[in-house]
Amino acid sequence: SAASDVYKRQIQKPYGSTVDYNKDLIDRFNHGELMNADSIHFPDSLKVQTKKLGRTVYGGGGIMPDYFVPIDTTLYTDYHRNLVGKGVIIKFTMQFIEGHRKELANKYKKFESFNEKFVIDDNMLATLREMGEKEGVKFNEEQYQKALPLIKTQLKALIARDLWDMTEYFRVMNTTNESVQKALEILNSDEYGKKLK
């Protein structure tokens, strides 16, 4: 899921209610802040220099990340959104697990083995598409192909969540989360280590 991308600047920012939080998020999306770093503006009055490293930070709640990873909204197509909205993704996952629970438990005793070897195959995807049609989700080849990597990841993550827990769900989902992958790359780089000295 792209939660880490979306909520970056909400950290430490005070909100009176969930409604205020959601409104701010929608406003930021509409202003392009989640897609382009140039759309994020802070008044100069909020700039503060850190004492130790002399880095510029901003007061007033929220943070500005050192590196910006835009949200790619093209991966989440209308076709995929309709599969999710009509409950097809969840229904398919539950039916698959109930029909294969014993087999999955015997084959994948540890999550690491599941994560490395389990694949969402063509038969599973054909069943998903059929279920979608039955629920009134009209198949769209172009949108399906565009969303396919995300659909596969989501299905695998939901199966992992049922067999294990939320930690394993996120371990699968984060393999295709661009913000998480970029963060891991940066945190393991010499360049970022130098910034913190």
Question: PLM ranges: what are they?
Answer:
Residues 10-197:
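Conserved functional hotspot residues or short segments at active or partner-binding sites
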Residues 2-7:
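Short, small-residue-biased leader/transition segments that mark boundaries at the very start
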